[in-house]
Amino acid sequence: MRVAPSGGPPHHHAMIRATPPKRRLKAGTINVAPSFMRERDLMECGVWPVAGCDEVGRGPLAGPVVAAAVVLDPNHIPKGIDDSKRLTAARREELFEEIVATASFAVACAPIERIDRDNILRASLWALARAVHALPDTPKHVFVDGRDRIDIACACEPVIGGDGLVLSIAAASIVAKVTRDRLMCKLARDCPGYGFETHKGYAVPGHLEALGRLGPSSHHRSFFAPVVAARERHRALLAGASASISETSATVAVEAVI
């Protein structure tokens, strides 16, 4: 697996509101599986390699954005590839191992420093471009999930809802999701108390409670609104506790000399 390095110039950004974790489709919802049709059409026209790329982690309050780019082997495509949000964690892990064993792929992370410095959108697009650049073979065409183009030398085709339509994007969504989930579990060991291993940094009630109690960690995104609010509340609590300690110390000191 190739991992792209970080770096680049800063950009201005505004405070961001958190988004909840995306959910898998409910039972009974129509689920049209992504297909390899677009990649095959290009391949038959002599355009190859064709990559799909996707990112995970725009919405959470903590942790990096992880992007992946995948070029599937037309002769060895794992069965069951789908939008990562439609799969259980166990099935994602299984497909991850099959994809990385048969496909060409690369991942890139936009760390918390870049997210705070640039803003979440720029950091996400940067990570997507870095993942494509890190592929072992330069693609001639790239499908990217969403509406935004990325800064790459080859043809770039945004596909809204692409992780549910284009098979190589779906594969990239699985690689990015599993990689980020594993990174968040590692952060949970390095920074205990927030429950990163459970919610992966999203703004669920347990995470918000821990933020209010512990204050933000170095892995939290400084300009996301719940983090800003938690930081201010935590400072107020610390200031109140400090004032209480000072008053108690002064009382003890006075009593000691009476």
Swiss-Prot record:
Residues 1-20 are annotated as: Disordered. Its EC number is 3.1.26.4. GO terms for biological process: DNA replication, removal of RNA primer; mismatch repair. Keywords: Cytoplasm, Endonuclease, Hydrolase, Manganese, Metal-binding, Nuclease. It holds the Pfam family RNase_HII. It comes from the Bacteria. GO terms for cellular component: cytoplasm; ribonuclease H2 complex. Manganese or magnesium. Binds 1 divalent metal ion per monomer in the absence of substrate. May bind a second metal ion after substrate binding. InterPro entries: RNase_HII (IPR022898), RNase_HII/HIII (IPR001352), RNase_HII/HIII_dom (IPR024567), RNaseH-like_sf (IPR012337), RNaseH_sf (IPR036397). It is found in: Cytoplasm. The keyword tRNA-binding does not apply. Residues 10-20 have a biased composition (Basic residues). Its cofactor is Mn(2+); Mg(2+). Signal peptide: none annotated. It is an enzyme of class 3 (hydrolase). Coiled coil: none annotated. Residues 48-236 form the RNase H type-2 domain. The keyword Oxidoreductase does not apply. GO terms for molecular function: manganese ion binding; RNA binding; RNA-DNA hybrid ribonuclease activity. It catalyses: Endonucleolytic cleavage to 5'-phosphomonoester. A divalent metal cation binds at D54, E55, D145. Endonuclease that specifically degrades the RNA of RNA-DNA hybrids. PANTHER family: RIBONUCLEASE H2 SUBUNIT A, RIBONUCLEASE HII. Belongs to the RNase HII family. This is Ribonuclease HII.
